[in-house]
């Protein structure tokens, strides 16, 4: 696929930029620039290796994983594929729409009721548990709706097909996950070196 080549080039550029940053930080610290923390020092190497996993563990990583699983489920269910709708698919689409509306109503009740569970302690929507869980909520809505459609329309014949759709979604997202890893590491390295 064409976007794989673009992502591979971006990853290569980020890798080169990371190596250049290692040597640039060392060079700038050697010229007695006080505001620069070198990555090629004992402190810098300890920071880089010791914080590597901690720096990558961000909500955005979980969001990418959840969205890729939801995307795979939606794609494999065939809910958006233009095709001649049989009676079974029309019925499945109607039931899935009803399920989606019910789920949206449940989420709305968890947000709009007085002293709602998903509001912050001050009663605000942003920031709140709802705003922090927005991507997981949207992913769950997409997964449940497309799973319902897929099982009713027989594009999913078993729960293994649903599981397989998650795998397919994750497989399609792997290049973006690799790009994410390199972007976060370069960004965090720049913050360490210069700030």
Tell me the role of every PLM-derived stretch.
Residues 1-84, 97-112:
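Transmembrane-helix bundle segments that line or gate the permeation/cavity pathway
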Residues 24-32, 79, 109-121, 148-158, ...:
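Transmembrane helix-loop junctions in multi-pass membrane proteins
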Residues 51, 60, 90, 115, ...:
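Residue-identity detector for glutamine
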Residues 57-65, 95, 128-156, 162-194:
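Core transmembrane alpha-helical segments of multi-pass membrane transporters/permeases
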Residues 76-89, 151-164:
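Cytoplasmic membrane-interface regions of multi-pass membrane proteins
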Residues 88-113, 174-187:
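Hydrophobic alpha-helical transmembrane segments of integral membrane proteins
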Residues 89-97, 108-138:
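Flexible hinge motifs at transmembrane-helix junctions and intramembrane kinks/re-entrant loops
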């Amino acid at each position: 696929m064409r976007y794989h080549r673009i992502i591979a080039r971006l990853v290569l550029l980020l890798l080169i930029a990371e190596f250049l940053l290692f040597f640039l930080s060392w060079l700038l610290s050697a010229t007695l620039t006080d505001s620069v923390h070198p990555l090629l020092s004992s402190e810098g190497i300890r920071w880089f290796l010791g914080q590597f996993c901690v720096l990558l563990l961000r909500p955005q990583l979980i969001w990418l994983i959840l969205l890729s699983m939801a995307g795979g489920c939606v794609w494999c269910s065939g809910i958006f594929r233009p095709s001649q709708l049989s009676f079974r698919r029309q019925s499945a689409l109607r039931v899935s729409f009803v399920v989606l509306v019910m789920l949206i109503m449940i989420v709305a009740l968890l947000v709009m009721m007085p002293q709602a569970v998903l509001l912050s302690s001050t009663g605000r929507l942003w920031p709140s548990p709802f705003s922090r869980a927005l991507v997981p909520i949207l992913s769950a809505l997409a997964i449940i709706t497309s799973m319902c459609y897929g099982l009713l329309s027989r594009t999913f014949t078993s729960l293994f097909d649903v599981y397989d759709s998650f795998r397919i979604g994750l497989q399609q997202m792997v290049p973006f996950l690799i790009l994410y890893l390199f972007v976060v590491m370069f960004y965090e390295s720049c913050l360490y070196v210069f700030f």
